[in-house]
A protein has these predicted regions:
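N-terminal loops that bind phosphate or other acidic moieties
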Residues: 1-61, 67-151
């Protein structure tokens, strides 16, 4: 089974899980770990304890809120130090939904394609992609002649 840990600063991960539950119903394979402002326990300890409760054959994904953030950096380091999971930085709801619903592990090129697909959800719906890709037209500057107007 795929186990998804949403890891964020503040309440973002809990809010994302709430959204997943609204769409999917029970999401017992989605878990939340948050870094609170006054937290004394390192987030890495929380994740290690959570992973210890999973089955040995589960595939674990830790989806973090921001690339380069303390949460993300701690998860990357933890994954390099022997705890087996895949880190995906900058998660969004479509990515989390797809991983939560997948009956099989998503790895390699398939995971890369899923991440690219999730990026397509980040758009300005009021400006079609074609318009955004087109070069902007330069406005013509008004011509002013120096001196008083000629009659």
């Amino acid at each position: 089974m795929n186990q998804i840990i949403l890891a964020s600063h503040g309440g973002l991960a809990a809010g994302a899980k709430d959204t997943l539950e609204m769409v999917l119903g029970d999401v017992s394979n989605v878990h939340v770990v948050s870094l609170a402002r006054d937290d004394k326990e390192p987030i890495t300890n929380k994740v290690e304890a959570m992973i210890a409760t999973f089955n040995a054959d589960d595939t674990v994904y830790v989806l973090t809120d921001m690339l380069g953030s303390s949460v993300n950096n701690n998860m990357v380091e933890l994954s390099k130090n022997g705890t087996k999971f895949t880190v995906v930085s900058g998660f969004n709801i479509p990515l989390a939904l797809t991983l939560a619903m997948s009956p099989v592990p998503v790895k390699g090129a398939e995971l890369a394609a899923l991440i690219n697909e999730a990026r397509t959800g980040l758009t300005n719906p009021n400006a079609p992609v074609e318009a955004a890709a087109a070069p902007a037209k330069k406005a013509k500057a008004a011509r002013h002649s120096p001196g008083p107007p000629k009659h």
